[in-house]
Amino acid sequence: MTPKRALISLTSYHGPFYKDGAKTGVFVVEILRSFDTFEKHGFEVDFVSETGGFGWDEHYLPKSFIGGEDKMNFETKNSAFNKALARIKTANEVNASDYKIFFASAGHGALFDYPKAKNLQDIASKIYANGGVIAAICHGPLLFDGLIDIKTTRPLIEGKAITGFPLEGEIALGVDDILRSRKLTTVERVANKNRAKYLAPIHPWDDYSITDGKLVTGVNANSSYSTTIRAINALYS
């Protein structure tokens, strides 16, 4: 029997972003929880980034944001999570036909590379065309800007409903002016540009995720578990 396999994408960007000079990159909580959930549901999980590199968002490191099993999995060198991270692939090394689910994790680093990550977009579109699922969380839907449905040659999210981190959340974090000054986009703008319907949560920190066919999106790290479960359910629907 062919094993069930999921591919989690990471942003390759790891550079200065915050006003205090701290770097952004991958939001560790999102990938810890999605990885754990996939594994507990019988999936083999691999990580990929556009360049094969990644770094952690320095404002959201484990000491403040995780505990219990998540913390143990992050800090244990030979945990399944860290072993998978050590095998991270560049996007051009990945065979899309090996996977049933593409899961775009985020962190503010995704603002910089996801909209132009052509190889990641190519993998996601092929998985979707083969009957697989595309899921994205928080800033992950920025990958949809330029992602094409192979069968229609139209934007893959056109006519579909998506969610993702809202501008209200950027304002609450005090980074909305950084987005403006660096000409970085938002999930809602990507939705509008590609003729999708953006559905906002009542509050930016709510656990909120939605499914539209084989497309699944979640609004923040608190939605990691529900988004992953929706992706698994969508695969078998």
Swiss-Prot record:
Active site: C138, H139, E170
Name of this chain's protein: Probable glutathione-independent glyoxalase SNO4
Matching Gene3D superfamilies: 3.40.50.880
Role summary: Catalyzes the conversion of methylglyoxal (MG) to D-lactate in a single glutathione (GSH)-independent step. May play a role in detoxifying endogenously produced glyoxals. Involved in protection against reactive oxygen species (ROS). Important for viability in stationary phase. May negatively regulate TORC1 in response to nutrient limitation.
Keyword annotations of the record: Cytoplasm, Lyase, Stress response
GO MF annotations in UniProt: glyoxalase III activity
Primary location class: cytoplasm
Consequences of knocking out this gene: Results in higher sensitivity to oxidative stress, reduced thermotolerance, accumulation of higher levels of reactive oxygen species, and reduced chronological life span.
Recorded catalytic activity of this chain's protein: methylglyoxal + H2O = (R)-lactate + H(+)
One GO-annotated biological process of the protein: methylglyoxal catabolic process to D-lactate via S-lactoyl-glutathione
Lineage summary: Eukaryota, Fungi, Dikarya, Ascomycota, Saccharomycotina
Entry GO CC: cytoplasm; P-body
Localization per Swiss-Prot or TrEMBL: Cytoplasm, P-body
InterPro entries (UniProt xref): Class_I_gatase-like (IPR029062), Prot/Nucl_acid_deglycase (IPR050325)
Family, similarity comment: Belongs to the peptidase C56 family. HSP31-like subfamily.
EC number per UniProt: 4.2.1.130
Organism of derivation: Saccharomyces cerevisiae (strain ATCC 204508 / S288c) (Baker's yeast)
